[in-house]
Amino acid sequence: MANIEIPYGKSKLAFDLPDERIQGILRSKAGSYKVNMSEEDIVKRALENPIGTKRLQDLAEGKKNIVIITSDHTRPVPSRITLPLLLDEIRKKNKSANVKILIATGFHRGTTLQEMKAKFGEDLVENEQFVVHDSRNSENMELIGTLPSGGKLEINKLAVEADLLVAEGFIEPHFFAGFSGGRKSILPGIASVQCILANHCSEFIKNPYARTGVLENNPIHRDMIYAAKKANLAFILNVVIDSSHKIVNAFAGHSEKAHLKGCEFVSEIATVNAKPADIVITSNGGYPLDQNIYQSVKGMTAGEAACKDGGVIIIAAECADGHGGEGFYRWFKESKDPQDVMNKILSRGRDETLPDQWEAQILARILINHKVIMVTDSKNYEYVKDMFMTPAKDLGEALKIAESIVNNDSKINVIPDGVSVIVREK
């Protein structure tokens, strides 16, 4: 008997599985990756040895208006560690620079003051200049080019007006951009809603290269790279974290070169080989990534990659924030089945993309080929049902439901943290 723990909200769900039922337990190697350095020292080492560019302190010398793009409340970037070190590096040769910290919300809701203090610490919030990006506020946007896809590249004016643009973030597998981090700080991070919608169109989401761990020929990534170049993103600090959100590696320097090095590292530790199973049990990595159903689609894509067609995906996600997007929810609430959702989305052109359409498209793709059971807070049960999934109170109940759909002795793949792995079929 194997005891399995799955991240769920700010805690974990534990359950036992007979050894003979387990086809594979698929984990990123990040959890076992050993570093004999403190998190601070890992970041300092990266800042002192930038990839493809000068040190940040040298780039900052003589600059008057510096903007640091950081991640919002939905991302587990350990900014309490990284931001002070970035600020210190900038101020080593430029104590008088005006530094603004721009929170990249992308298409998410704005980060609240309470969430800012929880993420960055009260001292930092009270003593530094923070600005929350609002993709819907057209007055704060500036047109700086046309994306390879044809969409208008509009980003926050603060970034355009900066004489040095820096970004921090983290690199993990991403379910349609290939990997997070790097260029994503610009698009979707600080882009306008119209720009984000064009980049996330149904044509691109459908593209077979718009998948986890894939950058080459990925049209979404191609747009993002262009956006970072046009925005003059001069320096990045991207970290890699384990399942406890501890820093295990860091990459700093040129926005594309440093990011690619980081992606290579993540690919090495995150790629798992799986034989598809009838049942897959996974999660969205716990808080803050499982705050809503919308975000939890990411974890489901790992389940999709490790599950047979017609199989069952069980995802544990607390979803304290509910469905996470009215537009996303309505795609399902107002459709007769997942195929109906997909047909409606694919009928929309590149310039007709609606808010949250991409997440609905990916969830519909999963639901067309698999049953999904969601272990979540009971307040979400109606949402889950409306979205053609089945709610369950715990993993035991979820497994019983799954076994009523497939055989009782079906093999099971377990992916404790679905957002941390790149699943490749054996």
Curated annotation (Swiss-Prot):
Catalytic reaction annotation: (S)-lactate = (R)-lactate
Active site residues of this protein: H108, H174
GO molecular function terms noted in the UniProt entry: lactate racemase activity; metal ion binding
Main enzyme class: isomerase
Pfam name, any one: Lar_N
Keyword Isomerase annotated: yes
Needed co-factor(s): Ni(II)-pyridinium-3,5-bisthiocarboxylate mononucleotide
Keywords: Isomerase, Metal-binding, Nickel
TM region(s), chain numbering: none
EC numbers: 5.1.2.1
Binding site for Ni(II)-pyridinium-3,5-bisthiocarboxylate mononucleotide: D72, H73, T74, R75, K184, H200
Sites where the protein binds substrate: Q295, K298
Activity modulation comment: Activation of the apo-enzyme requires the three accessory proteins LarB, LarE and LarC, that are involved in the biosynthesis of the nickel-pincer cofactor of LarA.
InterPro entries to which the protein is assigned, alphabetical: LarA-like (IPR048068), LarA-like_C (IPR043166), LarA-like_N (IPR018657), LarA_C (IPR048520), Ni_dep_LarA (IPR047926)
The keyword Isomerase is assigned to this record: yes
Cofactor: how and how many bound: Was originally shown to use Ni(2+) as a cofactor, but in fact, the cofactor is a (SCS)Ni complex, a nicotinic acid mononucleotide derivative that is covalently attached to Lys-184 and forms a tridentate pincer complex that coordinates nickel through one metal-carbon and two metal-sulfur bonds.
Family affiliation: Belongs to the lactate racemase family.
Assembly behavior: Homodimer.
Known role: Catalyzes the interconversion between the D- and L-isomers of lactate.
Alphabetical list of PANTHER family matching this protein: LAR_N DOMAIN-CONTAINING PROTEIN (PTHR33171), LARA-LIKE N-TERMINAL DOMAIN-CONTAINING PROTEIN (PTHR33171:SF17)
Record protein name field: Lactate racemase
Source lineage: Bacteria, Bacillati, Bacillota, Clostridia, Thermoanaerobacterales
Gene from which the chain derives: larA
